[in-house]
Structure formats: structure tokens, C-alpha cells
Amino acid sequence: MAHKKAGGSSRNGRDSEGRRLGVKKFGSEAVIPGNIIVRQRGTKWHPGANVGMGKDHTIFALVPGHVRFETRRGRAFVGVTPLAEAAE
């Protein structure tokens, strides 16, 4: 009698997908308005100059320029250094 008894279904074998969080544009990278710089939960990075923050704490560029990361008073800030204005 080389038979197996009917096995019950496994209760394992599922997991949630990753959330794709983190830095999307790194220091000195060029950005245009609307580019997402950081996707995060909470304010791991705080908004600095020329960036906005969405309701899910996503930091995005408001002006064309280059990304800048800095630390002030123990907090990490993300900003955008604007491109030099064209000569009039």
C-alpha cells in the first residue's frame, strides 16, 4: 500500500510585493519640474528649497535644476539647485 494520504492545502506561499520606495534621483542629477526625487514613508528626508512634498511624503522637483542632499540640525534635507538663468 504505497499510497499517500490526501494532503491538506499549504497555508504558506504568499507575500506582499515590494513598495518601490527610496531615492529616485541622486545628488547632482538633473531634474525637471514634477520629477520624483524620493518616495518614502514618513519624513526620512525633509523638503528643502525648490521641492514639494505630496500627501504620501513623496518629494518632487518644482523647478528645473540639480538635486542636492544636505543635513541641517540632524535632519536630512533634499533640495534642487536651480539652473542658471539664461543671459538677457
UniProtKB/Swiss-Prot annotation:
Keyword Ribosomal protein: yes
Region of interest: Disordered: 1-24
Gene Ontology MF term list: structural constituent of ribosome
Superkingdom of origin: Bacteria
Assigned keywords, A-Z: Ribonucleoprotein, Ribosomal protein
Annotated Gene Ontology cellular component terms: cytosolic large ribosomal subunit
UniProt record, GO biological process: translation
InterPro entries in the record: Ribosomal_bL27, Ribosomal_bL27_CS
Family: Belongs to the bacterial ribosomal protein bL27 family.
Protein name: Large ribosomal subunit protein bL27
Species this chain originates from: Methylobacterium radiotolerans (strain ATCC 27329 / DSM 1819 / JCM 2831 / NBRC 15690 / NCIMB 10815 / 0-1)
